[in-house]
Regions:
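Polytopic transmembrane helical bundles with strong interfacial aromatic enrichment
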Residues: 1-187
Length: 187
């Protein structure tokens, strides 16, 4: 890399701080979307659906903020694990809701909104994979700090980032398609 170790540490810290905004936005996306859909008359969610949606979102926001603020490694690991478990549960639940809706048996209309929910569920999988592929960066950075730059360390960092970027781009494509479906509402 053309950057010094200290510059790379600063860049990584900045990236991790910036990363909180899309994570918080993602945590709020479903309940806000549900409320907007209700306001537009597209869906009529019951009080229980709204309460569950907002409660899960609030829990998720607490986990995300906790992950960023955790100072003790054990607490950070615990919150990260909770985040991964929540992502897997939400992936399965939202994909199931989207799929049953697309097939005409779910809580949402089968057309564009069913597809939007299904694709939204796939974003959870992208988030899981982004985190999983990025995981090797931390131990590689620790080695970089201890041993200095070596080809295998640089390769580990570059490979992890490159694999993460594939999932980030996939997530962006899903967001664009979801935005199109919500805007165009094709029949």
């Amino acid at each position: 890399s053309d950057l010094t170790f200290d510059q790379r540490v600063i860049a990584l810290r900045m990236a991790l701080k910036i990363d909180i905004l899309p994570r918080l936005s993602f945590a709020l996306m479903f309940p806000v979307g549900l409320e907007l859909s209700a306001a537009l008359g597209v869906v009529e969610p019951g009080l229980a659906t709204r309460a569950i949606s907002w409660s899960v979102s609030a829990l998720w926001v607490v986990i995300v903020i906790g992950m960023v603020r955790a100072r003790e490694p054990a607490r950070a690991r615990s919150l990260k694990h909770a985040n991964v478990v929540l992502h897997w549960v939400l992936f399965l639940v939202v994909v199931a809701i989207g799929l049953t809706s697309v097939l005409g048996h779910g809580p949402f209309p089968a057309g564009w909104l069913g597809w939007k929910i299904l694709l939204f569920g796939l974003i959870f999988f992208c988030g899981i994979m982004i985190d999983r592929e990025f995981d090797p960066v931390s131990p590689a950075f620790a080695r970089l700090a201890a041993e200095g730059s070596k080809p295998d360390i640089e390769l580990a960092i570059k490979s992890a980032i490159d694999r993460s970027i594939v999932w980030v781009l996939t997530l962006y494509v899903l967001v664009v398609v979801i935005a199109f479906l919500g805007t165009a509402r094709p029949s």
